[in-house]
Curated annotation (Swiss-Prot):
Keywords: Cytoplasm, Methyltransferase, rRNA processing, S-adenosyl-L-methionine, Transferase. It is found in: Cytoplasm. HAMAP family: 16SrRNA_methyltr_J. Belongs to the methyltransferase superfamily. RsmJ family. Specifically methylates the guanosine in position 1516 of 16S rRNA. It holds the Pfam family SAM_MT. It comes from the Bacteria. The lineage of its organism: Bacteria, Pseudomonadati, Pseudomonadota, Gammaproteobacteria, Moraxellales. This is Ribosomal RNA small subunit methyltransferase J. SUPFAM superfamilies: S-adenosyl-L-methionine-dependent methyltransferases (SSF53335).
Amino acid sequence: MVKPMHLFAVVDALEQAQQFQQVLASRDVSTELVQIEQLNARFLRHHPELALCVDLDGLWLSANGMKMQPDWQAEIPRLKRASLKSEMIARACQINEQPSLIDATAGLGHDSLLMAYLGAHVTLVERHPVLFTLLEDAKSKAENDPFLSKYMQRIHLIFQDAHYYLQQCNQDDRKVDVIYLDPMFPQRDQHHQVIKKQAQVKKQMQLLHLLLPEDGEMDLGDQLLPLAQQIASRVVVKRPKHAVFLNEQQPDHQWQGDACRFDAYFQISM
């Protein structure tokens, strides 16, 4: 159950904010719409609580003077530099074969956007109503972007718990080429020490942790791995370089980078 939130909106985006309020209400998220003059740094400092904001840039999350937005358009420079050879994630997920791929831990959707750009047909699964609404807004804006629009037909958003969605796929005998997992929790090394992240990533993670508290209801990813292995011929798990294996399961192959690695699990019979 999501706690009631403020929905701050500038005057020029008030109509859009009302639409977001209706969408969120349909997903059992209660918001109090507050019209303000400016959504600037000063306002955010004076309103440190977790809140949603709407301006001409769309919908975003704020807390403790920070803001977070999927903002797929900001990823365009990265996409233009990317290639099947240069991106480790592309090699790990065999994007050159244009696979059907489920991203069961969607997050902000940046990895899925990259994989769709490089040729994969991606289904993003997200259970949290606020994060899903943020992803919807990011995709909607991307559909109207001259550069991104042609890649959006390869991206499909599913508002559902990933564990339940994968169970349904298994029961319906639906198979995919790849399932991609990038669990938010836990991010600890073999000595159980918390792994340090870059400053910008830290800010995004702080807001995500406020939105998605690490409690008994949060799926830590360990439960997803064995389920994913029943559905996909290849399961790829993104981990910090020195993190423990997901579900304490040794991968069949690894791709190692400076800050992270990709652990791959193969099901040859599929």
